[in-house]
Every structure is written in structure tokens, then in C-alpha cells.
């Protein structure tokens, strides 16, 4: 329970004094801080007290205090390896100051890293047999806790939490647990939750139901308990609706959890409500606040050179965009000129969003909150209002647009000799698509005549892109060219085709050019030690590489997990997988072994790209880190002084952007599942060729040749009793020894597909099983899903959105395996 700040006490006293007035038998309230407002619930009574609305001050003093606090906490953790009294700690740290020491100890205790025993002795939690971590509920009575561990160390095994040992924790909460000295009969360490350190979230989605005169919300995920709702807190929701409920009381031995309906998401059991629930769960909102829309609509839709400032005029240059057929926001354009010394001037021209979205404006605050645009079939939830993203910021053809240009000198072999950056004004000569450029490069006569003015440039660009790619691979970059399913929808939003997204020459061309710009800007900022937001990718976990090495060994590969920096060994695997269908699972397994890329305020390099310097610069319309990179680069070019506030802003932007990217990925993945399930409903009862894509104790995941993935439950696997071999990630027959592991081919029958949960069920085709539209099994959750790696890094590091050919109608996803 958090301590009430002193300035809130008058309000708490006021609430407490309400009890005799209302006649309520017991005082119980929840407290929530949001945008400078204290939200407190006194049973069904809501009160608001505005404390302040101004932003907290940030500056050098705060930065120094933060660093000092971190240093003090580190010293305390070193001292408290053995139990100490407060007097002993003060003797060890005589200059710490009484208040600073108390605050540091309180922070460590609140975070679960330090504990105090009954004798008032402090020590690290591990000394008392305790550990802090994340509570991972299951759809049964038991759970697990993933313990915290220092960066760079091997991940410890999850701790098993038996029934009735949850301590009131909910899925995703941070908890402190007491670890048992003995292991259970499955060899797992057990633990008991002794304290909830922090709650994961305040809102859930589910169906509103009524039993008698009482109302409840049954959460979409069975990992959460049922929540009681007072009849006065239903809002406009009706029984049977899908709703978002905020938790006002998490429940205890006497009371069940209680909540308040916040949003009615539509009729439960419909795909529309399911999509709305996914968006809400991930904090993705389609509607912009009025003040944001007003600011966006007030921006002129034509370039005003009078207010554009001093700029490099590139309007006479051959500059054009290349995007997908259905793209609406064009945030990057390219150009290429031959220089007198035989080198090329490669131009990457990015929409100058920072000219229109200024710091601390409503537009900026909303862009920071959203962090990124979210894409799903036939729809986009933009980071910026369409007046900007599809209007004045979009590099539309044959109109003047403000840009931020990266002009790089490269030779025919892809060596970069230098780069210059400038605010510019451009006029795109053509809106090209990937399909058109691919056909031009393939020799399409009609298109080559129509776009004769850029054919030679496009061909030279393609040759340069090949040279850049070759140099990138030679330095050790990993080319994880893993097919990604593409869902095509009709004009009504109904899925009509699922297929793998194609990557032609033009897609690769744009990717290479965007990578060059991103690296050039990162190098410029990092070498000058200037603050910005970088895109970083750490070395993989050796334990995960050991698992990958065991899978690669039967194919003749010898992987040394202790040398992750030697990416040549992984490149050998990737080359072999391209030429052997039996090995095509290996790139996916390698991807799952890698760390997830993230944003940071420090330049530590990008492992997958083998780049010493890297950030995101090329998509400011749809990514907030790119917008920050633009602002910081412009400040550097103008020679302005950077402050501690800039450093703080970059750190906050990096953390927020990483979190919002993860939310966007979750959103896109879960909504794609709904569309795929909707599409597959027409094929229930049919058989398909498939391949095992993941193995868990409850069954095997299989993927069809169009990318659709579903589950075969263990009890439906016929011919033997199958047991899970966790070490080798395999399902093994007890009597026959038959093994199902990742990559095993199967013939499967589709049993069920739900467009409200996204779950798809298969069975082995040789089994005689009834076919139904629904199976009574729990919904598959993130912790149960076969991992798919860092989807965002596969799709976004190039700076491009989604593209692809238009759908050609419904196609069954079967074809003979070659």
C-alpha cells in the first residue's frame, strides 16, 4: 500500500469524515493518480481533487540527485549482503545523510531488493531466502514467478507458485516471494508470495454478466478473477456487452475484487468488440483529444516558405517516394546523383515533422503518449492526426514539402565517405510503388516508358543497394529474411486472402537506403556525445543460444554459444536454410534466441545489424523516437547548447517508445489472429500440410504454409501417450519414441476457429475427431504462445510501413510440399 503524500492528507481526512454522513459501515477507498488529478473511490462515490497541472521541473539538479540516489542504492546493496542494523549502515556510509539513507532504504524495500527482519536488521532479500519478480498467472489455480536478475547474467528458472500461495497477486504484478528450500515432484523450485510490490494494470476487459441482482465482469483472459461491479457503476453498459473495467479493490479474504465499468466496447461475442478490447487493453485509442485535432487542423496544408526558415532548396532534383500500394503516409523519399569523383550522392529525404510538431505542444504530448502508429488489416491508428500524417507532412507527389535530408557520399562498392544533414524543401516527382519499381527493374516495357525519366536512376539505385547489402553482410549483419503473413481484406474489412508478404528488389533497395541514413545520423550524434534516442540491440543470451545450437547440430552446424559476437557462424546457418527446405525452421529459431531490440539514450550498437551506431530517423510520422532524433540533430546543427533537460527527455522518450512499441506489437499480433481465425472458419473440416512451430507441455503449435498458426492439444495426439521433453522442446511418444519438435511436418485437420478469441484448433489428420466451430478450452495467452521474435524489428528497422500486392480473392491455403 503506498504511503499517502503529505499534501494529500487534507483530502484523505475529508473522505474519512464522510463515513458518518453516508452511514457506510466501513471506510475503503482506492487511489489513482492521472494527469495531475487524484482519483479516489469511496465505495460508489467518486471525488476529484486537482492538485496541480503544471509539468514537474527537470534540470541539472534533478539529474545529479538521481545519479546520487542510484550510487547510494548500489553501495547499500554491497553492504547488505550480510544483515546490518541501521547504526552499522550509518557507520559504513557516514556522509550519506540521514534522510538520503532512509529514502534509499525505503526505495530498495519497496522494490523488493532489501528486507528488514523482526530484529530490525536489513539485508538483501536473497539472504532471507526471498526474491522479487513478475507474477505469471495461468488459467488454472497455480502460477509462476519470473525472478529479477542482473543484466548480463543467465536468466534463472521460473518459480512455481502452488494454489493458495498467490498472496493476492494478479497476472503481471511485481511480487516478493519466499522460496522453498525443497523442489516439488517435477523438480521445480516452489515459492509463496509474501508481498505485492506493484500492480501491473488498473483496467481489464471482459463480458458483463448478471447473477440475480448482482453484476460481474468475466475477464477475457481466465488468468484474472471475476470482478464485482455495483449497479451504480455500470454506466451505459448492458448485460452481455464487452466492457473495460477499472479495478477499485483487488480483493482479499473477505471481499472479492471490485471495479467500475469505464467503457462499453460493444456486444460481446463479436469480432468488432474483440478488436476494440485488444486496442483498449494495449492503450491504443483511435480518437484524438479535441485540442490536438484543433492544433492539427489549424496548420496550413500548403508550405509557407516565409515561415519555413532557411532551407536547402532541392525542388529541382529527381526525388521520388517508393511505398506500398495501399500506403497513405509517405515519410521518406530518395534521390541519387553521380559526383565528379565517380562517387554517388545518396539522398534520403524525410518528412520534417518536427517543424509542425513542436515540443510541449498538445500534438507533441499526444505523439509521446502514443509512441507509434498501429497497423492492422485495412486500418491504421496513427500517431499523428491524418491532417499531418496524410496531409502536410506526407511527401505527396508534385507538391512542395518540408524535409530533413541526409546527403551521403558513397562509392559503387557501398563505402560511405561522409554525410551532411540539412533542413530542406523538396518536390517529389513521382509516387512510386514497390510493385511498379520491381516491374521496372524486371524490364516491364510499359512501365519503363511511362517512367522513363527515372528508369536509369532506379537501376543505379538498385546496383548501389546490392553493394550496400554486400558490405553489411560482410561486416557480420544477420539477414533474418523470415516470411511474414499478410492479410488482405475487401472493402467491407472482411479477410479474403492470407499469404506471405513478398520482398522484391525495391523493398530491399529502400531498406538499405534507410539503414544508411539511420547509421549516418547515429554516428554523427554519438561521436559528438550528444543526447538523442538510439535503437539498440544487445548480444543474445548464451543459454538461448545453447538451445539453438542443439537444434542446429543435427544439420551439421557447430555453434559456439559462448561466442555470440561471432555472427559468421549464424550467417552460415542462414545461408544453408535458404537452400534446404528442411532447414527453413532454423532462421525462426535463431530469431527467438536473440534479444529484443529497444530504444535507449545510450549508443551501445545493434547486434543484428552489426552496426556500431544506429538509431531511427526515417519515420517521424509514425514513430516518436524518430521525431526526437530530428529535434536533437537540428539542435546540434545549429550549435545550440544541450541541457540536462534534453538528456532527461531522451531517456523518458526511449522508455516510453519501447513500451508503446511493445504494446503496438501485441495489438497487431492479437488482431491479426482474429482476422486469420475469421478467414479460416470457411475451411473447418479440411486438411492441410503443416509444420510444428512450437512445443509446450499442453500441446504443439503448427503453422500452415500461408502462415496461419494453431494448436494441437496433447490429448488429441493419437497413436501413443505423448510427454513434453522441455530440454529438447519436443513432444515424445512414451511407447513408440516418436518425436514432434520444431520443424516436424504434419498433416492436420482444422477443428475450430474463433474470430472473437483468435484461437485456432487442429488435430492430426489421421485422427477421427468431431469437427465443431468451438472447443471448450482456455484462450491461448502470450505466455502460452510459440514465441515469434521481435516483430517490430523485422518490420520497422527499415523505416517502411506495410506494402504488398492487392488481394486476388479467396484461396484455400493448401499446396503440395516440394
Where does each model-flagged region fall?
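Electropositive polyanion-binding surfaces
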Residues: 10, 91, 239, 244, ...
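Intrinsically disordered, low-complexity linker and terminal regions at domain boundaries
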Residues: 713-756, 760, 773-781, 785
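A short macromolecule-binding patch
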Residues: 153-161, 224-229, 708-724, 772-774
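Charge-lined substrate channels and their catalytic hotspots, especially those that engage the 3′ end
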Residues: 36-347, 354-400, 438-439, 730-731, ...
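Internal insertion modules embedded within essential enzymes
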Residues: 206, 254, 751-765
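A generic structural signal for residues embedded in beta-strands
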Residues: 177, 245, 695, 748-750
Amino acid at each position: 500500500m503506498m504511503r499517502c503524500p503529505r499534501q494529500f492528507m487534507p483530502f484523505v481526512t475529508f473522505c474519512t469524515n464522510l463515513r458518518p454522513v453516508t452511514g457506510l459501515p466501513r471506510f475503503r477507498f482506492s487511489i489513482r493518480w492521472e494527469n495531475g488529478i487524484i482519483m479516489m473511490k469511496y465505495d460508489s462515490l467518486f471525488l476529484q481533487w486537482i492538485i496541480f497541472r503544471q509539468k514537474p521541473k527537470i534540470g541539472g539538479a534533478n539529474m545529479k540527485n538521481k545519479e546520487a540516489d542510484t550510487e547510494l542504492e548500489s553501495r547499500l546493496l554491497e553492504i547488505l549482503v550480510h544483515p546490518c542494523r541501521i547504526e552499522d549502515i550509518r557507520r559504513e556510509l557516514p556522509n550519506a545523510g540521514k534522510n538520503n539513507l532512509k529514502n534509499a532504504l525505503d526505495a530498495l524495500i519497496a522494490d523488493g531488493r532489501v528486507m528488514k527482519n523482526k530484529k530490525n536488521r536489513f539485508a538483501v532479500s536473497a539472504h532471507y531466502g526471498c526474491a522479487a519478480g513478475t507474477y505469471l498467472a495461468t488459467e488454472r489455480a497455480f502460477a509462476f514467478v519470473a525472478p529479477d536478475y542482473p543484466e548480463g547474467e543467465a536468466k534463472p528458472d521460473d518459480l512455481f507458485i502452488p494454489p493458495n500461495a498467490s498472496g493476492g497477486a494478479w497476472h503481471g504484478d511485481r511480487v516478493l516471494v519466499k522460496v522453498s528450500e525443497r523442489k516439488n515432484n517435477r523438480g521445480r523450485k516452489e515459492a509463496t508470495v509474501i508481498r505485492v510490490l506493484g500492480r501491473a494494470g488498473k483496467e481489464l476487459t471482459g463480458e458483463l454478466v448478471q447473477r440475480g441482482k448482482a453484476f460481474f465482469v468475466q475477464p477475457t483472459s481466465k488468468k484474472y478473477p471475476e470482478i464485482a461491479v455495483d449497479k451504480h457503476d455500470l454506466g451505459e453498459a448492458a448485460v452481455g456487452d464487452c466492457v473495460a473495467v477499472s479495478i477499485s479493490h483487488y480483493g482479499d479474504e473477505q471481499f472479492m475484487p471490485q471495479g467500475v465499468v469505464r467503457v462499453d466496447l460493444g456486444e460481446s461475442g463479436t469480432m468488432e468488440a474483440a478488436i476494440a478490447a485488444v486496442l483498449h487493453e494495449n492503450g491504443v485509442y483511435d480518437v484524438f483529444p479535441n485540442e490536438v485535432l484543433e492544433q492539427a487542423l489549424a496548420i496550413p496544408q500548403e508550405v509557407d516558405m516565409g515561415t519555413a526558415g532557411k532551407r536547402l532548396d532541392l525542388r529541382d532534383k529527381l526525388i521520388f517516394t517508393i511505398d506500398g500500394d495501399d500506403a497513405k503516409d509517405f515519410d521518406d523519399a530518395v534521390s541519387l546523383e553521380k559526383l565528379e569523383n565517380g562517387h554517388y550522392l545518396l539522398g534520403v529525404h524525410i518528412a520534417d515533422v518536427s517543424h509542425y510538431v513542436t515540443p510541449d505542444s498538445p500534438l507533441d504530448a499526444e505523439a509521446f503518449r502514443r509512441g507509434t502508429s498501429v497497423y492492422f488489416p485495412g486500418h491504421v491508428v496513427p500517431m499523428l492526426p491524418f491532417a499531418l500524417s496524410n496531409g502536410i507532412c506526407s511527401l505527396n507527389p508534385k507538391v512542395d514539402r518540408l524535409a530533413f535530408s541526409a546527403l551521403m557520399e558513397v562509392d559503387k562498392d557501398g563505402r560511405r565517405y561522409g554525410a551532411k544533414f540539412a533542413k530542406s524543401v523538396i518536390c517529389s516527382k513521382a509516387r512510386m510503388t514497390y510493385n511498379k519499381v520491381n516491374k521496372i527493374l524486371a524490364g516491364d516495357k510499359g512501365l519503363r516508358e511511362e517512367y522513363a525519366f527515372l528508369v536509369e536512376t532506379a537501376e543505379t539505385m538498385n546496383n548501389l543497394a546490392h553493394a550496400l547489402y554486400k558490405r553489411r553482410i560482410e561486416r557480420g549483419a544477420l539477414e533474418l529474411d523470415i516470411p511474414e503473413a499478410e492479410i488482405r481484406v475487401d472493402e467491407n474489412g472482411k479477410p479474403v486472402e492470407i499469404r506471405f508478404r513478398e520482398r522484391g528488389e525495391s523493398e530491399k533497395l529502400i531498406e538499405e537506403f534507410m539503414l544508411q541514413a539511420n547509421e549516418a545520423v547515429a554516428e554523427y550524434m554519438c561521436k559528438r556525445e550528444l543526447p538523442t534516442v538510439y535503437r539498440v540491440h544487445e548480444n543474445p543470451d548464451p543459454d538461448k543460444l545453447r538451445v539453438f545450437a542443439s537444434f542446429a547440430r543435427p544439420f551439421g552446424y557447430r555453434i559456439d554459444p559462448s561466442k555470440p559476437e561471432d555472427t559468421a557462424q549464424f550467417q552460415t546457418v542462414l545461408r544453408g536454410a535458404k537452400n534446404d527446405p528442411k532447414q527453413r525452421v532454423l532462421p525462426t529459431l535463431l530469431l527467438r534466441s536473440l534479444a529484443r531490440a529497444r530504444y535507449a539514450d545510450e549508443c551501445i550498437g545493434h547486434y543484428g545489424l552489426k552496426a556500431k551506431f544506429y538509431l531511427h530517423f526515417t519515420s517521424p510520422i509514425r514513430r516518436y523516437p524518430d521525431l526526437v532524433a530530428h529535434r536533437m540533430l537540428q539542435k546540434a546543427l545549429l550549435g545550440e547548447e544541450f541541457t540536462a533537460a534534453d538528456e532527461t527527455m531522451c531517456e523518458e522518450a526511449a522508455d516510453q517508445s519501447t513500451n508503446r512499441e511493445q504494446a503496438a506489437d501485441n495489438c497487431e499480433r492479437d488482431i491479426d489472429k482474429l482476422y486469420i481465425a475469421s478467414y479460416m472458419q470457411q475451411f473447418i473440416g479440411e486438411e492441410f500440410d503443416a509444420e510444428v512451430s512450437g512445443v509446450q507441455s499442453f500441446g504443439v503449435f503448427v503453422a500452415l504454409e500461408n502462415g496461419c498458426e494453431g494448436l494441437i492439444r496433447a490429448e488429441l495426439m493419437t497413436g501413443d501417450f505423448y510427454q513434453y521433453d522441455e530440454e529438447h522442446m519436443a513432444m515424445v511418444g512414451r511407447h513408440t519414441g516418436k518425436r514432434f519438435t520444431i520443424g516436424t511436418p504434419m498433416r492436420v485437420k482444422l477443428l475450430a476457429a474463433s474470430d472473437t478469441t483468435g484461437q485456432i484448433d487442429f488435430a492430426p489428420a489421421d485422427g477421427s475427431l468431431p469437427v465443431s466451430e468451438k472447443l471448450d478450452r482456455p484462450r491461448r495467452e502470450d505466455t502460452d504462445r510459440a514465441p515469434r521474435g521481435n516483430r517490430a524489428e523485422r518490420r520497422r528497422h527499415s523505416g517502411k510501413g506495410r506494402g504488398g500486392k492487392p488481394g486476388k480473392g479467396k484461396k484455400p491455403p493448401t499446396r503440395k510440399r516440394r
